[in-house]
Structures are given as structure tokens and as C-alpha cells.
Amino acid sequence: MIKVHYQDDQENLMEACSGVMNTLIETDRGVKSAFSDLISREVMEQFRPDKDHFLIHSTAMGDQETYGPNKNGDGWPKEALARKHQTFVTNGHFFREHRNRDPKLKIGDIKYAAYSPVSEGGMGRVELLKWGHRKLAEEEYEMAKEGKELCFSMSARVPLDVCSCCEHKAKSASEYC
């Protein structure tokens, strides 16, 4: 089963981020400071893009215990985000408009992922550093330079879906209660 998550579907997280989920990081003159408590200046410098790419900082998703489910009623438990956030880097790519089946269609790559647990004073969310290819993601780059908000979706293969009301487990939509 594939579950889709849009950044702006988690209203409480959007509010906590003041509506800004993606930010273009200009690195032409070096990285002057950390972007967030989770992504340090050193990490940003380590993932500084080459001349063919630009850098986007994204707040990807928040855990359901802190921010609740998204508009579809889907949520990701903090334990799952703590354990699996690196799969954004190992399995993920940067695509346009949910064209995410063929890696040949990617417009960039996810270079870094981190999760900050609330129990350790964090925000209970996953943050990413993404490289967008300046030519393949030209539209996104221009929008980001103009300060326009970008919104990306994420998807994941999950073995089953669990109903938030009765905890019924379904392996496909046809098994939903």
C-alpha cells in the first residue's frame, strides 16, 4: 500500500512553522549560520551544493503525537520517524508533482534527513536538505528565489493501514472498515 503525505496537509505543523515549509538556502558565499536547531551550520556546509544544484531546507512532516494526523487522517508515529527518517535519503528523490515512480524523472536528490524527538527538546519533526538541479528544477528554483512557497509530497510503501478509530488493519483500501 502506498501512502501519500503533502507537507501542507498537517495543519498543526504548518502553524508551528508559520506556514513556511521550504526555504531556499543561498550558499554562494558560504553558510553563515544554522538554519534550525536540528540542522547545524556544519551540516549545511557539508551538504553545500555544487554549481549545478541549489539547496532547499524542508520541514517534511511532524509526528502524529505532536501534530496530529494530516487531512486524510494519516499520521506517522514518532517511533517510526525516529527509526526510518534516513529512508528519505536512501530511498527518496526530489520529484515534481508526484511523478515519483521512475527515478529518471527526478529533479534533484534528498541529501540529508534528521528527526528531532520532543522527548529530547526537539520539535517532533523531520527536516531535510534537498539538492534541486538548476536546469531540471528551474521552475522550483525561480519560485523559491521569488519567495513563493513550494509544496512537496512524500509517499511511502507501508505493509498495512491502521484505522485511527477501531485499529482495524487493512492491507488495501478494499479492506477498510
Spans of model-derived segments:
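Signature of dsDNA virion morphogenesis modules
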Residues: 1-177
